[in-house]
């Protein structure tokens, strides 16, 4: 037998959870750098377990296993006891305890936490995308986006982009301004990936005045004038009509309400369904 301690990490998924716990525990034993881990991932049958125990036969081993399959975990326990291996079952007692108290049966599916982690990183990627391409900073992002939101100023484009990015959707928003040509990329993508936003003239007049005031500017500036708002609104509606994209009037709608409408449109059109 080797004197060096080897910690066997046995999992029906990657084994990252068990390894993290093992590392936390070993930090309480400084000076034992010769102890090391050996990880066995995707152990989902008794045959695979037997291969692990065969490899353990010539080593000083401490077994740590995270197996959501109750029968497989029970088999691993019995094998450890019959071979006199020290072991700890990381999941069974906790899962059974929660199930007993809550009255809810566990899913029994390995790798769920890892899938949740993947979802988290996808969400972060989508949020970073929305920030990078906010307010039409780089129209080339249109070709990479799951969704393109277009509209004139103060139609909730940015907050909607961020809200939808949190749903794992890569969103770019493009401001429509009469003096600025429409990005050519808008005509290179499926119009079902584009959502146009409009607002009532009166509401736009009010929110733009508030915006000007917050910037320390006069509320009588052209930006908030009814004539300018009407000009922009007509221009935007013409662009949206030519593109053939769905149009949503966001007047008196909360961000969440508009986002729900957008998600339903995307689902109906079969767009970015993988993210929803």
UniProtKB/Swiss-Prot annotation:
Keywords: Kinase, Nucleotide-binding, Serine/threonine-protein kinase, Transferase
Signal peptide range in chain numbering: none
Pfam families: Kinase-PPPase
Annotated InterPro entries: Kinase-pyrophosphorylase, PPDK_reg
Annotated EC: 2.7.11.32, 2.7.4.27
Binding site for ADP: 151-158
Keyword Transferase: yes
UniProt GO molecular function: ADP binding; ATP binding; phosphotransferase activity, phosphate group as acceptor; protein serine/threonine kinase activity
EC top class, as a word: transferase
Chemical reaction(s) catalysed: N(tele)-phospho-L-histidyl/L-threonyl-[pyruvate, phosphate dikinase] + ADP = N(tele)-phospho-L-histidyl/O-phospho-L-threonyl-[pyruvate, phosphate dikinase] + AMP + H(+); N(tele)-phospho-L-histidyl/O-phospho-L-threonyl-[pyruvate, phosphate dikinase] + phosphate + H(+) = N(tele)-phospho-L-histidyl/L-threonyl-[pyruvate, phosphate dikinase] + diphosphate
Keyword Kinase part of the UniProt annotation: yes
Function, in words: Bifunctional serine/threonine kinase and phosphorylase involved in the regulation of the pyruvate, phosphate dikinase (PPDK) by catalyzing its phosphorylation/dephosphorylation.
Family named by the database record: Belongs to the pyruvate, phosphate/water dikinase regulatory protein family. PDRP subfamily.
HAMAP family the UniProt entry points to: PDRP
Protein name stated in the entry: Putative pyruvate, phosphate dikinase regulatory protein
Organism: Streptococcus agalactiae serotype V (strain ATCC BAA-611 / 2603 V/R)
Lineage: Bacteria, Bacillati, Bacillota, Bacilli, Lactobacillales
């Amino acid at each position: 037998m080797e004197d060096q301690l080897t910690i066997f990490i046995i999992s029906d998924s990657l084994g990252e959870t068990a390894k993290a716990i093992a590392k936390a525990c070993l930090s309480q034993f400084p000076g034992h750098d010769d102890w090391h881990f050996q990880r066995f991932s995707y152990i989902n049958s008794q045959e695979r377990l037997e291969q692990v125990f065969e490899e353990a036969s010539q080593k000083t081993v401490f077994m740590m296993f995270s197996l959501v399959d109750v029968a497989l975990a029970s088999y691993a326990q019995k094998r450890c006891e019959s071979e006199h291996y020290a072991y700890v079952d990381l999941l069974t007692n906790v899962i059974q305890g929660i199930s007993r108290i809550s009255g809810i049966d566990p899913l029994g599916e390995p790798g769920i936490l890892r899938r949740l982690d993947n979802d988290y990183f996808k969400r972060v990627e989508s949020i970073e995308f929305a920030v990078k391409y906010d307010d039409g900073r780089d129209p080339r992002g249109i070709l990479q986006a799951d969704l393109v939101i277009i509209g004139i100023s103060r139609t909730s484009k940015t907050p909607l982009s961020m809200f939808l990015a949190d749903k794992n959707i890569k969103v770019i928003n493009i401001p429509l301004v009469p003096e600025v040509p429409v990005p050519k990329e808008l005509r290179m993508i499926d119009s079902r990936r584009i959502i146009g936003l409009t607002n009532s003239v009166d509401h736009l007049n009010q929110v733009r005045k508030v915006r000007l005031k917050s910037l320390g500017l006069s509320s009588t500036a052209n930006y908030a004038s009814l004539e300018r708002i009407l000009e922009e609104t007509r221009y935007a509606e013409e662009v949206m009509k030519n593109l053939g994209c769905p149009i949503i009037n966001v007047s008196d709608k909360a961000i969440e309400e508009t986002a729900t409408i957008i998600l339903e449109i995307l689902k109906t059109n079969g767009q970015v369904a993988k993210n929803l």
